[in-house]
Design a protein with these regions (language model features):
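AMP-binding/adenylate-forming catalytic core of the ANL superfamily
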Residues: 290, 297, 441, 446-447, ...
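Conserved AMP-binding/adenylation subdomain of ANL enzymes
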Residues: 225-243, 253-295, 310-314
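N-lobe entry segment of adenylate-forming
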Residues: 1-72, 76-91, 95, 586, ...
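Conserved C-terminal "lid"/linker of ANL adenylate-forming enzymes
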Residues: 514-519, 530-531, 551-606
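Conserved pre-ATP/AMP-binding loop-to-beta segment of ANL
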Residues: 57, 188-206, 212-213, 223, ...
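Structural core segment of the AMP-binding/adenylate-forming
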Residues: 2-11, 118-187, 300-301, 306, ...
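Conserved AMP-binding/adenylate-forming core of the ANL superfamily
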Residues: 59-111, 131-138, 195, 219-225
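Conserved AMP-binding/adenylate-forming
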Residues: 325-327, 334-477, 485-487
Length: 607
């Protein structure tokens, strides 16, 4: 980007609290642009937006009924973001100060995010509440992020400002809390906003959903632009006539990087449906793809499963999904059966199974690490379950009656990135040997913000990122077999096993270090959280009461169901240092419940 100072002198011409509009009053941004497409290649986000704003494409927001609610062309985004940046400058914050934004699927969030970058501030997206019964847990989660980031400003739409104000009561770092509308009412400061530098922090991405130890991934402009270029050029092969549709939350790395920032740096239009609206009626997402002829749309596997289960056969006749050329799949373990069921269900609506595009990534590497080859669909291999468990070897099998695990080909690393597999001693493994997945490349994070201890665990010498995942390489392609970290992914949500265990240990009947939580997957890929408790209670009534209470507490805190198993004292396995081994606890549970061969090999364990 040029070193020319950007002068912000455009008047504020509209309120920043968008009001719903009827579809007859507004039209979506077009698919075909008047601007020559440039596939990333920019130095910073703001330089990319400056270019995109010269065209006529942009973001479109739809309500639960599929009606167009708001339109935000890139030209208007630039204008509004610049004006908001001048108002943010009025706080006289040091460059690089953090700004927290509750990231609902709205134009306001996008404007605030880019306003922060124009003002030289570092935004980060905070989640919206996912479970109405977890008010206190949600506020605690927000408070943890505010304190961890030492945020100076916090913003939320009117629907969520109450949560934010409650969370901010104990956050001494904050200088101002408000809504986008209130920010828009503040006076503009007549300043020149300096352009961003590629080595500056672009944003923080919080991971794991932890309420006690949130970790903010530090992503620089350079890392972001490198990852975006790999995604749009090598992964998706974006074209001028592409259009995207998304239900993914803006606070998720796939939603933010893949479906907000990637479309902007390629100047294509996007149609959004709020995550909660998708969850209620996934048909609306498919309708957007069909009606607006969207070509690129990503989902987590559970989203495809939801479509397969919820969309009625009678609805298929109104859909034409033949336009959908890149059906990206990622963010959690990919089960081939989930993709097969989706393809079978929607083939009559024109969906081509070759559109499936499995990929692998994580926030600590900005977003994407590997992509399978576009246009080839989902490729998988059958692996001997016994060899996988006993020898950590991926031994290929034909259909001969032996127990098998089927794993999806997640493709090859993006240009400039390397993936290697190592054993417990850190030695690199050959192909078809199962071990820890490490990644090296320009997209890898600088570290976790203000968290040296967690950074040192994740980043190894040579700037190798320990992903916490387990997998193997075959003919240069990556296959993920499970997770080694203590994160359990349920319906696209990351839940820390430690948080569940600590919740259990708060009960008077449960002693410290006598609870172990992990995830197990059944044959169709559904993840279930299991909580094993060492229990001294003998009364059947008391044991049932404890089981029910723990299930209710987990649901209230995390919005998910769990299985509770009570076992005798000293049952849970421990490492040589006395720590609980979630991997061994999980294996013991599988053996006790006779589920061997029906479950994926490793879903959570010891880092």
């Amino acid at each position: 980007m040029s070193s020319t100072i950007i002068k912000l002198n455009a008047p504020l011409t509209q309120a920043f609290d968008f009001q719903p509009s009827s579809e007859s009053q507004i039209t979506p941004t077009p698919t075909l642009n008047t601007l020559t497409q440039q596939l990333a290649g920019f130095d910073t986000l703001t330089s990319a937006l400056e270019y995109a704003a010269e065209g006529i494409t942009g973001y479109n927001f739809y309500d639960a009924k599929g009606n167009l609610r708001s339109v935000l062309p890139y030209s208007l985004l630039r204008k509004n973001a610049r004006n908001l940046a001048q108002r943010l400058s009025g706080f006289d914050l040091p460059r690089g100060s953090r700004v927290a934004i509750i990231a609902d699927t709205s134009p306001e969030f996008v404007e605030l995010f880019f306003a922060c970058r124009y003002a030289g501030l570092v935004p980060f997206a905070m989640p919206v509440p996912v479970n109405l019964g977890s008010h206190a847990i949600y506020v605690q989660q927000l408070r943890g992020m505010l304190e961890s980031s030492q945020a100076s400003i916090a913003l939320a739409n009117v629907d969520y400002i109450g949560f934010l104000e409650e969370a901010a009561q104990e956050a001494t770092c904050l200088k101002w809390v408000g809504t986008p509308g209130k920010l828009g009412e503040l006076p503009e400061k007549d300043v020149e906003l300096k352009p961003n530098h590629p080595d500056e922090t672009a944003y923080l991405q919080f991971t794991s959903g932890s309420t006690r130890t949130p970790r903010g991934v530090v992503i620089t402009e350079r890392a972001l632009m490198c990852n975006l270029q790999g995604i749009v050029c090598n992964g998706l092969e974006i074209k001028p006539d592409d259009r995207s549709a998304s239900w993914l939350p803006f606070y998720h790395d796939m939603g933010l990087v893949g479906l907000v920032l990637a479309p902007m740096v390629t100047q294509i239009s996007v149609d959004y449906l709020a995550t909660r609206d998708f969850a209620i009626r996934p048909l609306q997402w498919l309708r957007l793809i069909s009606r607006n002829r969207c070509t690129v749309a990503f989902s987590q596997p559970f989203g495809l499963k939801l479509c397969s289960l919820r969309v009625r056969e009678s609805d298929l006749k109104e859909l034409d999904l033949s336009c959908w050329r890149a059906a990206g799949i990622g963010a959690e373990m990919i089960r081939p059966e989930t993709l097969r069921n989706f393809a079978e269900k929607f083939s009559s609506a024109g969906f081509d199974e070759n559109a499936f595009l499995p990929c692998y990534g994580l926030a600590e590497s900005t977003l994407a690490v590997t992509f399978s080859k576009i246009g080839t669909g989902c490729k998988s291999i059958q692996i001997d379950s016994k060899a996988l468990i006993d020898k950590r070897m991926a031994v290929r099998l034909q259909a001969d009656g032996r127990k098998q695990n089927e794993f999806v080909n997640c493709g090859r690393p993006l240009p400039g990135h390397i993936v290697k597999i190592i054993d417990e001693d850190g030695q690199q493994l050959s192909e078809m040997m199962v071990g820890s997945v490490l990644v090296q490349g320009e997209s890898v994070m600088m570290g976790y913000y203000n968290n040296i201890e967690e950074t040192s665990k994740a980043l190894k010498p040579g700037n190798w990122l320990d992903t916490g995942d387990i997998g193997f390489l075959f003919e240069g392609d990556l296959y993920i077999t499970g997770r080694r970290t203590d994160v359990i992914i349920v319906n696209g949500r990351n839940i820390r096993a430690q948080d569940i265990e600590e919740l259990a240990e708060q009960q008077p009947e449960v002693r410290s270090r006598e609870a172990s939580a992990f995830g197990v997957n059944d044959e169709d890929g559904t993840t279930t959280i299991v909580l094993v408790i060492e229990c001294r209670l003998t009364s059947v009534t008391e044991r049932q009461s404890l089981t029910t209470r723990l299930q209710q507490l987990v649901y209230m805190a995390f919005g998910v169901n769990c299985v509770v198993e009570l076992v005798p004292p000293h049952t849970l396995p421990r490492t040589s240092s006395g720590k609980l081994s979630r991997f061994a606890a999980r294996q013991g549970y599988i053996q006790r419940t006779n589920l061997t061969g029906q479950l994926s090999v490793v879903e959570s364990g010891d880092r």
